[in-house]
Structures are given as C-alpha cells and as structure tokens.
Amino acid sequence: MIALSDSTLHRLPAAVAVPRYDRHALKVGVVHIGVGNFHRTQEALYIDEALHLPGNESFGICGVGLTDGAAARAKAAAYKVQDGLYTVTEFAPDGIARTRVIGAMIDYLHGPADPEAVLARLTHPDTRIVTLTITEGGYNIDETTGVFTLTAPEVAHDLAGGEPRTVFGYVVKALARRRAAGLAAFAVASCDNLRGNGDTARNAFVSFARARGPDLANWIDREVDFPNSMVDRIAPQVSDAERAKLNASSGVDDRLPAMAETFNQWVVEDRFRYGRPALEAVGVTFRDDVAAFVAVKGRMINASHMHMAYPSILRGERIVHEAMRDPRIVRLISTFLSRDVIPYVEPPTGVSVANYETMIVERFSNPAIGDQLLRVGGDGASKLPIFHSKTIATLIAAGADLSREAFLLACFARYLLGRDDNGSDFPVFEPVLTAADWEQIRDEPAGVLRAAPFTSLGLADHASFRRAFDRVTETLAQYGASKALDDVLAET
C-alpha cells in the first residue's frame, strides 16, 4: 500500500480519485470545528468538489479539534503526516464502492496544543466562514428553558479569561479581536443535526458574548450570519478492523479513512454575506424554507433511526443493517411513518414524502455501511426530544394512538440500564443526563419521563401515554424486547 500524502497522490491506484486542483494555490476561507466523520464525508466533500471549479480557491478548510487526550493528539499528528488528506469510500446499497481522496482540508490545528494558533486562524482576514459539528448537545442550551448555561465549568473558565477551552470561548474571542482590528465578522454555520441549528448557534454564541459585555454581543448578533441548515448522510465510525479493510481495498495506507453511504444532502439558507464557495454547483440546495426540510428529515429519518435502535439493542443486535433484517423492525418503521408522521407533516414545496419509507428502509439496510446501533442510540436524551417531541405533541392534540411512541420511550428507559435481554452489558453514552436525572431513572423506568430533557413533553402525567408506557415497561422487564415488539405491532 502507498502511504497517503501530497507527494504520493500521483502514485495512488487508478481506481482512487484524487484532487485535480492545485492544493498549494488554495487559501483557508473556512474553519471547521469538530472534524469528525460526518464533516469529513459531507461538508468537506462538497467543498472538495467545489474546489475543482474556478473561483473557489479562497475556500480551503482549516480543521480544528478542541478535545484533548491521546486519541485527539494522534488524530492531529496523522493529519500533519498526511498533509490533511484522507480517503472517503462511498458504499451504494448494491455493494458498489467508490474511493476518493479529499483535499479540501489544507491545515489542521489542535486547540489544546496551541490555542493561539486557532485564535490567529479565526482572526485572519481570509477566514469568512466557521462551520461546526459539535453534536446536538454541544451548544450548552438548557433543553427546558432554552437558555445558555453560563455555569458550566468550561464555559465559566472561558468567561474568566485566559486561554479558551470551549468553542464559544474561541469563536467569541476571535470575533472580539476582529472587531477591535476593524475587520469584518464571519458566518457561523452549524452543521449539527438539530432543528434551527443556526438559531441555536446564535443563541449560544450571543449569550456567551453577552456575559462578557453587551456591546460585543450586540455586534455579533448584528454582524455574524448564522444560517440554518439541514444535513443528511450516514457516516459511521471506522473501527481498526474496518480501517484495515478499507485500506486493503483501496490500496492506500490512510491513517484516517472515512466511509459513508452514497446518499448525501445539505440544504442551507443563503446567508453568507462575507462570501462562500459555489456549493449550489455541486449539489447543495439553498432554500429559505430550511425548517420544512429539517422537520421532514428529523421526524421521518432520524426518528425512525431511534425507533429501530433501542428495541434492537435490547434484543442483542449491534449493527444497523443486521437489525433491519428483522421484518418486524421494518414494519415498525413503516407503521410509525404511515400513521404517526406522514398524515401530519407538511413537506417543503416541491418535495414529496411518498417514497420516504422505501428510501429509509433501503438506507438503513445498506450492508456495506455497518453502522453501529450504539452510535445511533447514544445521546438519546438529547436526540429523542429533538426528533420526537413534535410528533408526540401532534398525536396528543389529535387524540391519536400513542402506542408506538410509548414503546420507544419505554425501550429507551430500559436501554439506560446498559444490559440487553441476553444479559450482555453495553456502554451507555448520555452526556446531558444529570445526577438528578439518573437518580429518578434508577428509582423507576417512568423516571425518564421526569428527567430534565423530557419534562417539556408532559408525558409523566398523561394518562393514556402512561398506561401504554407502563404496559411496555412491564413486558420488557418480564419477557424482553422481542415480545414487546410483537405486542406493539399487534396493536396496529
């Protein structure tokens, strides 16, 4: 295999597509914070395609990592060795794979190692866009009040001055420097999977800045664009075994290969007053009604992902496409969509949801992706309210059947125990649940309905929901998820 770097691009196997533009002629115009697999296979891929078109040379990417630890340092070192290059292998449902090298990231900075370098890059006049993938729960917004939490330890540290540690500290400090130097601001574009991600980002950064002083906060609120967007692509984690397999298949020795499905969608508001690459020429959709796209995607695709994940994990499954081999899971998704979502959702103008069910099942069933159920189910306390609150509220208002949503939350409560029906333990990743939340959850399964992320749903005291929830909870405890799944399907 050939080690990946700028100097070896011309020697890579012919089947591997490589950048055809001059990477040395690029300037950094985009700083991306949180360089995970999703960014590398979505935004960075679109920008890579745009860089092949004339006039976009000013929009190379500088990646930034803010987490510390051995893995984060190893990632930074690998990007340096590989000159920011990495491979993406896209797998179609029929198994056909295509590998390409992404050259859009021309620099990578590790904040804990050199905070000033990150600030200098953010402050540089060439930087016109800062994009984010910091996870749905990374905006430090209280789920119940919608207020930015100033007392979070790392936030409090950054507000006290000194070298920043949080994304809020870095971005706001850089904007303060730009303002003091008479430079224009930049756009801050969230690419995280939540409704109103731009509005959420505005709330977070302006609130942080307001704690420093009203003048800076007002300037940021006025001068920084925060476009809303909808992003959609499945890009699973790559294990060591999968890394070896990807590299053996491509013939490229890549320390950081990424993989994804062929489906890719990015819908974004065109609010980039300081300039942007011509992304519309490479498949990105610019629309004013992003919220409608987010609603359809969240309530149908992301919500279905969660319906599939928790009962499957409890039954001992760990891989998404293997869980989809159970026709009951396919039927659960189909029934959820046809009865609980499609009759009530309003799709964007010109968009039909008629084929969504088939598309969702096909995407989830892609055997080449090997997506992890624990990844899909992780951080459920953040994701479930985001993707299911509107559906639950709509069903309650319509006096409709709540059995499938009760089944989902009962399975989630059981999942939080960290043990499946076979007696095997699994890790539970729920960073937004507090000690008080966990205390309620350990007292009884229904405690999850009173946990802070779920209180706004009002389900703990909703009689018909509680009857269904308690019934599923009892079945899960006595007979397991397979019987509970049979029961909820028998009710439809």
Annotate each predicted stretch with a short phrase.
Residues 1-492:
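Substrate/ligand-engaging "lid" and interaction regions
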